[in-house]
């Protein structure tokens, strides 16, 4: 996994997709047991920060609102300073993290990347891809494809990635409720609006990327249905995801 993380994180960086990167991998001299006995190693990651949705869940589990405020203030100061200028910085923080994740997952979908294990501990507050375990770039396009051997129900399948991301954002929202509004019901209403807007935000980012891949230079209302139909065709015919777009590019170049 360490070698895979180094290679794929560098590929993601070269593709312009926000990602952690690998600084070093050091052998421990011990064995670890996965599918088989493997040599142990420690990977050092470089990132804007290692704050994750899971970090907020851990603090929330302590029931200490002052500690949660310190964590949220630190995260805002480190990643989203503009949020402090908003009358409700914690709601704005949630909005910015949601937007950053919608953009990130749209980029994954545009290049056929399957993360594999999108739990809350693998969603960064900064919006960088992290933890390249059972991940891969698809060859033959299959929207239901999974790459984790334990994902027998397809929770983290390619097509489910936007929905899991939204679910993770909802978990982040839960941890921020005491900071968003002293009245719990008002806080829920405000946070829910942002969580529910995730899908539309994702769709906008995804379609922008698909227009670029399909060579669509002008925006038309039917572009989304065209992009979806294209994916349905290559899935039905079991075509390679990346090469199908490359063929379009080559045809345009010939013209």
Set out the residue ranges of the language-model regions:
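Regulatory N- and C-terminal appendages and interdomain linkers associated
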Residues: 152-255
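Beta-strand segments within the central parallel beta-sheet cores of soluble alpha/beta enzyme folds
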Residues: 23-26, 119-122, 188-192
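Active-site alpha-helical segments that house and flank conserved acidic catalytic motifs
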Residues: 5-6, 10, 102-115
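Catalytic activation segment of kinase domains across protein kinase-like and atypical kinase folds
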Residues: 31, 37-40, 110-115, 119-178
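Membrane-interfacial amphipathic/re-entrant helices at transmembrane-helix boundaries
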Residues: 86-95
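A generic secondary-structure signal for well-formed alpha-helical elements
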Residues: 13-19, 26, 75, 79, ...
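Conserved ATP-binding subdomain of kinase catalytic cores across diverse folds
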Residues: 2-87, 125-128, 156, 167-169, ...
């Amino acid at each position: 996994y360490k070698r895979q993380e180094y290679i794929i994180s560098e590929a993601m960086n070269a593709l312009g997709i926000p990602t952690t990167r690998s600084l070093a991998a050091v052998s421990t001299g011990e064995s670890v047991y996965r599918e088989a006995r493997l040599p142990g190693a420690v990977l050092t990651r470089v990132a804007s920060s290692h704050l994750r949705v899971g970090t907020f869940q851990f603090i929330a589990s302590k029931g200490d609102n002052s500690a949660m405020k310190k964590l949220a203030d630190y995260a805002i100061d480190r990643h989203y300073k503009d949020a402090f200028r908003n009358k409700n910085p914690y709601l704005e923080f949630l909005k910015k993290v949601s937007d950053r994740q919608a953009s990130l997952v749209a980029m994954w979908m545009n290049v056929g990347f399957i993360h594999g294990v999108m739990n809350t501990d693998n969603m960064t507050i900064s919006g960088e891809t992290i933890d390249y375990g059972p991940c891969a770039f698809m060859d033959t396009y299959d929207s239901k494809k999974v790459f984790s051997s334990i994902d027998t129900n397809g929770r983290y399948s390619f097509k489910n990635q936007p929905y899991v991301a939204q679910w993770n954002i909802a978990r982040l929202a839960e941890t921020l409720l005491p900071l968003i509004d002293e009245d719990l019901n008002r806080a829920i209403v405000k946070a829910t609006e942002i969580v529910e807007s995730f899908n539309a935000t994702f769709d906008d980012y995804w379609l922008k990327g698909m227009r670029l891949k399909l060579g669509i230079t002008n925006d038309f209302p039917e572009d989304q249905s065209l992009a979806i139909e294209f994916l349905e065709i290559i899935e039905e015919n079991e075509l390679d995801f990346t090469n199908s777009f490359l063929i379009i590019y080559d045809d345009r170049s010939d013209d």
